[in-house]
UniProtKB/Swiss-Prot annotation:
Induction: Up-regulated by ethylene.
Predominant location: membrane
Family, per entry: Belongs to the alliinase family.
Role, per record: Involved in auxin production. Both TAA1 and TAR2 are required for maintaining proper auxin levels in roots, while TAA1, TAR1 and TAR2 are required for proper embryo patterning. Involved in the maintenance of the root stem cell niches.
Localization annotation: Membrane
Cofactor(s) in the UniProt record: pyridoxal 5'-phosphate
Catalytic activity of the protein: L-tryptophan + 2-oxoglutarate = indole-3-pyruvate + L-glutamate; L-tryptophan + pyruvate = indole-3-pyruvate + L-alanine
Pfam families listed in its UniProt record: Alliinase_C
Protein name: Tryptophan aminotransferase-related protein 2
One cellular component term from this protein's GO annotations in UniProt: endoplasmic reticulum membrane
Pathway: Plant hormone metabolism; auxin biosynthesis
EC assignment: 2.6.1.27, 2.6.1.99
Lineage, broadest ranks: Eukaryota, Viridiplantae, Streptophyta, Embryophyta, Tracheophyta
Length: 440
C-alpha cells in the first residue's frame, strides 16, 4: 500500500478532499442555473426538472393569447400540471400586496383561545366577520344562523365532518360515497386511518346498500367542473357539500348555497393555499360541536396568525368589490380564467386530438351577466385511440397530469390544472398544439 508523503498530513488530505468536492458541487449548481432549473423545489416535484418562474417573470395573459405559439422552450423540461397549486394569483397579489401587509407583534397569539364565548373557541373574531362579509358580497352561501368552524384547510374540516356525522355506536363504520369522477383525495383521506367510524363506499351512482350513508357533493366538481347535486337521494343519507370552487371566477353564482354542512377554503377562493385555512358553515349546533371536538383532539385549534392573514386578505377582496374606479379581485381572476379557457378550447378545436367538457351558460348574480363555467381544472380527454392519456402526455409531451383512474374514471381522461403560472401554462398550450399532430 502506497505511503502518503510526509509533507501531506491527514489534515492536509482532508482539506484537499473538501476543496475538490466543493468545486464539483459549485460546477453542478452553475450548470443547473445556466439551464434555468429552479433551485427552490417543492417536495412533490423534486424528482422532475420542472419549469418554474417567479411571479415577476410571469407574462400577462392578454399577451399570452398572442404569443404562446412562439415560445422558445427546452424540450427536456417537465411541465407539472398535476396539482392545483394556485400560483395564477401571484400577479394580482404582488400588485396589491401593500394592502394585505400586516405586522403581528411578539406578544400576540400566546393563548390557545380566540373567543371563549364562541362555540368555536379558536376562531378569530376578525376572520369570522370577514367570512360572513365575503359570502354576503359574493352571494354564494347563506351565513345567517350558521356556525362557523375554522380548520387547517378544508381537508381537516372534511375529516372533522366525517367524525361529527358518523354514528358513534356499535353499528359499524358508515359508508362514504361520491359520484364519479370524484375528488381523488376523498378515498385516501377517508380510509387513511382505518377508522371504525366510517369507510370509503365508492361511487354514489352505483351505491345500493341500505342504511345510513354519507354522500360528498362537490360543486363545482373537482375534477370536471360541473355543478352537482346529491345522487343517491335516500332518506337515510347525510350530505357534505364541498364548495371550494363555488366562486365567480370559476362558475356563475346563481344563488346562495344553503346546505347543512358547507366547506370552503382560502386556497381556491383567494389563492392562498400556503396559509392552510378553510372554514365550514354548519347549520346544526351539535354537528358543529363535534367538528370542533375533532379539531381540538387533532391540532388543539388552528393557527391564529394564519387566521388573521386570511381575515386581512378577505377584507381586501370584499373592499375591492366596492371599488368603482378599478377592477375587483374577482374581475381580475375571472379574466385570467376566461383567457385560459378560451385558449384551451381553441387548441382542442384546432387539433381535434383531445377534448374538454362543454358547459351550459348561466346568469351570474354577482357579475350580472351570462357566462359558461371556467373551472380550476380541465377534464382533458385524449382522442383517436390513446388509451392511457396520462402516460401519453408524460412520455411524449413531458407534461405531468393526474390520471382519470384516481377519480374513479377512465384512463383516457386526465385532470389538468388551470391555475399554474403563465409560463408553464403557455408552454403546455404550445406543446399540445404544435406537436400533437406529429406524435399521433
Amino acid at each position: 500500500m502506497g505511503q502518503i508523503p510526509r509533507f501531506l498530513s491527514w489534515r492536509n488530505m482532508l482539506v484537499l478532499s473538501l476543496a475538490i468536492n466543493f468545486s464539483l458541487i459549485l460546477k453542478i449548481l452553475k450548470g443547473d442555473r445556466e439551464r434555468g432549473d429552479s433551485w427552490d423545489r417543492t417536495a412533490y416535484v423534486s424528482i422532475w426538472p420542472v419549469v418554474s418562474t417567479t411571479a415577476s417573470e410571469s407574462s400577462s395573459l392578454s399577451s399570452a393569447s398572442c404569443n404562446y405559439s412562439k415560445i422558445e422552450e427546452d424540450d427536456d423540461r417537465i411541465i407539472n400540471l398535476k396539482f392545483g397549486d394556485p400560483t395564477v394569483y401571484e400577479r394580482y397579489w404582488q400588485e396589491n400586496g401593500e394592502v394585505t401587509t400586516m405586522v403581528i407583534p411578539g406578544w400576540q397569539s400566546l393563548s390557545y383561545f380566540s373567543d371563549e364565548n364562541n362555540l368555536c373557541w379558536f376562531l378569530e373574531p376578525e376572520l369570522a366577520k370577514e367570512i360572513v362579509r365575503v359570502h354576503k358580497v359574493v352571494g354564494n352561501a347563506v351565513t345567517q344562523d350558521r356556525f362557523i368552524v375554522v380548520g387547517t384547510g378544508s381537508t381537516q374540516l372534511y375529516q372533522a365532518a366525517l367524525y361529527a356525522l358518523s354514528p358513534h355506536d356499535d353499528s359499524g363504520p358508515i359508508n362514504v360515497v361520491s359520484a364519479t369522477p370524484y375528488y381523488s383525495t376523498y378515498p385516501l383521506i377517508t380510509d387513511c386511518l382505518k377508522s371504525g367510524l366510517y369507510r370509503w363506499g365508492g361511487d354514489a351512482k352505483t351505491y345500493k346498500e341500505d342504511g345510513p350513508y354519507i354522500e360528498l357533493v362537490t360543486s363545482p366538481n373537482n375534477p370536471d367542473g360541473f355543478l352537482r347535486e346529491s345522487v343517491v337521494n335516500s332518506t337515510e343519507g347525510i350530505l357534505i357539500h364541498d364548495l371550494a370552487y363555488y366562486w365567480p371566477q370559476y362558475t356563475p353564482i346563481t344563488s346562495p348555497a344553503d346546505h347543512d354542512v358547507m366547506l370552503f377554503t382560502a386556497s381556491k377562493s383567494t389563492g392562498h393555499a400556503g396559509i392552510r385555512i378553510g372554514w365550514a358553515l354548519v347549520k346544526d349546533r351539535e354537528t358543529a360541536r363535534k367538528m370542533i371536538e375533532y379539531i381540538e383532539l387533532n391540532t388543539i385549534g388552528v393557527s391564529k396568525d394564519s387566521q388573521l392573514r386570511v381575515a386581512k386578505v378577505l377584507k381586501v377582496v370584499s373592499d375591492s368589490c366596492g371599488n368603482v374606479t378599478g377592477k375587483s379581485f374577482f374581475d381580475h381572476s375571472y379574466d385570467a380564467m376566461y383567457e385560459r379557457w378560451k385558449l384551451l378550447k381553441q387548441a382542442a378545436k384546432d387539433t381535434k386530438r383531445f377534448s374538454v367538457p362543454d358547459f351550459v351558460s348561466q346568469r351570474c348574480n354577482f357579475f350580472g351577466r351570462v357566462f359558461e363555467p371556467q373551472p380550476a381544472f380541465a377534464w382533458f380527454k385524449c382522442e383517436e385511440g390513446i388509451v392511457d392519456c396520462e402516460k401519453f402526455l408524460r412520455e411524449e409531451k413531458k407534461i405531468l397530469t393526474k390520471s382519470g383512474k384516481y377519480f374513479g374514471d377512465e384512463l383516457s381522461n386526465v385532470r389538468i390544472s388551470m391555475l399554474d403560472r403563465d409560463t408553464n401554462f403557455n408552454i403546455f398550450l404550445h406543446r399540445i398544439t404544435s406537436s400533437f399532430n406529429s406524435t399521433l
